[in-house]
């Protein structure tokens, strides 16, 4: 699998994510499965935050209590999302090409995304919060650093929030507000020049969330909700570039 290369399905086949808008074929989505399949000391290298500071190149991520890692969850869910979008005629690219090696730093991922001039950028993650905390939250850059972050990115976050909730995935009860969280510390969002969100799909330390994440059926449920959110946003963006 080649990182950053646009891929589209040869024969569009509508996935289980039904009622998807029909005018999104040819649009471009950059998918960032958060974290790396492997890590070493290089992930501590300092890179720009997009707000004048620096932060680590990458974080190692979290895991469920049984040891299922965040990086594998985001990878497997990201592949499902990619397949569903390709089946709808959407062109996609991934930030990393495998789940067993070092991946690009957070600023490099943002630069890769911006270079594609995508209609949407979605970064997939899972939180490591308190065991009592359950549910997803959708992050966006705040305060915004450009007009895209101020408008379309927030719209994207709200549409994704609504579709996740409509799919039966609960909003976070321990962080953010009403399933949304405006943040200034996420480099990928700060550096984005195109509509961009980071979705924490659930809390890996919560028994109910982790059970969903650890099952293939659960990952498909997340992917189906994600494709509805992405497609719903794309439908508001006019024609493909």
Curated annotation (Swiss-Prot):
Requisite cofactors: Zn(2+)
Top-level taxon: Bacteria
Gene Ontology cellular-component annotations: outer membrane-bounded periplasmic space
Signal peptide interval: 1-24
Name this polypeptide is given: N-acetylmuramoyl-L-alanine amidase Rv3717
SUPFAM superfamilies found in the cross-reference section: Zn-dependent exopeptidases
Cell location: Periplasm
EC numbers for this chain: 3.5.1.28
Keywords, in A-Z order: Cell wall biogenesis/degradation, Disulfide bond, Hydrolase, Metal-binding, Periplasm, Signal, Zinc
Active-site positions on this chain: 200
Subunit composition and interactions: Monomer.
Further comment found in the protein's record: Disulfide oxidation is not required for folding of the enzyme core or in vitro muramyl dipeptide hydrolysis.
GO biological process, one term: FtsZ-dependent cytokinesis
Alphabetized PANTHER family for the sequence: N-ACETYLMURAMOYL-L-ALANINE AMIDASE, N-ACETYLMURAMOYL-L-ALANINE AMIDASE AMIC
Record entry for activity regulation: The structure reveals a short flexible hairpin turn that partially occludes the active site and may be involved in autoregulation.
Residue ranges annotated for the MurNAc-LAA domain, each copy included: 29-230
Protein family per UniProt: Belongs to the N-acetylmuramoyl-L-alanine amidase 3 family.
First-level EC class: hydrolase
Pathway: Cell wall degradation; peptidoglycan degradation
Keyword Cell wall biogenesis/degradation found: yes
InterPro entries (UniProt xref): MurNAc-LAA_cat, N-acetylmuramoyl_amidase_3
Function field: Cell-wall hydrolase that hydrolyzes the amide bond between N-acetylmuramic acid and L-alanine in cell-wall glycopeptides. Is able to hydrolyze the cell walls of several bacterial species (i.e. Paenibacillus sp., B.avium, E.coli DH5alpha, E.aerogenes, L.acidophilus, B.thuringiensis, B.pumilus, B.subtilis and E.coli W3110), thereby showing that it is a cell-wall hydrolase with broad-spectrum activity. May have a role in peptidoglycan fragment recycling.
Region annotated Disordered, chain positions: 45-69
